[in-house]
Regions:
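Short glycine/proline- and acidic residue-enriched helix-loop micro-motifs
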Residues: 51-54, 112-122, 175-185
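Active-site loop segments of alpha/beta catalytic cores
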Residues: 126-348
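Iron-associated oxidoreductase/ferritin-like identity signal
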Residues: 9-10, 61, 116, 132, ...
Length: 348
């Protein structure tokens, strides 16, 4: 990646993340959290309980999604990420999931015929609620904070589609199935990659300042599988996104940084299996996001949270770094712990 590449952002009151991406000095490391709008927030739980609808209905409700997305603003985060599900683009493909309460697909995608029947959506027509959410967030934020969009990576989406539900605990079996059926797998991943490119570019057109690709089961992939199936999708996606907008690759707990770095993403969101100081030294052209262990935020006392946060910041030395977790906030995380994590980072 070209060290001199410049990303274009609108004028923002809080421009820490834009400055990190453009290699400009920052007074502190910016921070946001995956799943920052969610169950660890009592206000989120109250709103969901009062509303009473299923998640699929909530995700379609533009005003409600905007309201939920903005809740973490009061935490002191340096970015807002759209409240939405990674499975959202699958419905207009003909593979819509219902939440019962977990995601369920009535007819799993397990044959080449079922792949051929999947449609390629037109985002401005078929996913316009996502565009309206991002437009609404941009209006509400009034240039105060950067806005993040996101999508599930093709292999992650394929795992859900083949399983017809959350692929846990059978991820390894499904990955073996994909490897054993290369014609089926290539056809499905090619189609999902095209959909993801269109979906993320639509999010950028609708107001996203940064986009993140979630490869949520990367820790279960062998390096040969990742290189054969996941990486070509990542490369094609990042190659075809708007080059003015930075992209982040999150490959959950995957440790081969060379493979991740070859994706073409501007930033890598890494887990606590990665030594941040070594990563930044090895890949000075990249931004790194992470990598405080989310289990410490969920289960550790405040002193442990402080230690983990400060250790992470010391590893990066405040250079080429956006502070985040190893992956998403766990359900049993207290709001007190989240706020302590953020406030500790502000004091560094």
């Amino acid at each position: 990646m070209n060290n001199k590449r410049v990303f274009h952002f609108p004028k923002l009151e809080n421009d820490l993340i834009p400055r990190v991406f453009n290699r400009q000095p920052v007074e502190r490391v910016p921070v946001w959290l995956m799943r920052q709008a969610g169950r660890c927030d009592p206000e989120y739980r109250r709103l969901r309980e009062e509303d009473g609808r299923s998640l699929e209905d909530v995700f379609r409700d533009v005003d409600f999604s905007i309201r939920i997305s903005l809740l973490p603003r009061r935490f002191g985060v340096d970015a807002i990420i759209m409240f939405q599900d990674i499975l959202t683009p699958l419905e207009p493909m003909g593979a819509g999931f219902q939440f019962k309460p977990g995601p369920v697909l009535e007819h799993p995608i397990t044959s080449l015929d079922s792949v051929h029947q999947l449609k390629i959506p037109e985002p401005a027509r078929d996913l316009k609620s996502v565009g309206r959410i991002l437009n609404g967030l941009k209006t509400e934020l009034e240039g105060s904070l950067p806005l993040l969009g996101f999508a599930g990576a093709p292999v992650t989406l394929a795992l859900f589609m083949i399983a017809g539900k959350s692929p846990n605990p059978k991820v390894s079996e499904i990955l073996d199935f994909m490897d054993d059926h290369p014609g089926f797998t290539k056809s499905l991943l090619d189609k999902l990659t095209s959909v993801t490119i269109d979906y993320l570019n639509y999010q950028i057109e609708s107001g996203a300042n940064v986009v993140q690709l979630f490869e949520s089961f990367a820790e279960s992939m062998s390096k040969p599988f990742y290189e054969k199936w996941a990486l070509p999708c990542h490369e094609r996606i990042f190659r075809n996104l708007n080059r003015d907008v930075p992209s982040i690759l999150f490959a959950k707990e995957f440790s081969d940084l060379e493979l991740m770095a070859s994706s073409g993403a501007a930033a890598l969101s890494v887990g606590n299996v990665v030594d941040l100081s070594e990563a930044i030294q090895q890949f000075p052209e990249l931004i790194f996001q992470g990598n405080v262990d989310n289990r410490i935020i969920a289960e550790g006392d405040l002193d442990k949270i402080s230690d983990a946060t400060l250790n992470c910041l010391k590893q990066s030395g405040g250079k080429n770094h956006i502070l985040n977790l190893s992956h998403g906030l766990l359900e049993n995380t207290s709001l007190e712990s989240v706020l302590h994590f953020i406030n500790t980072s502000h004091s560094f």
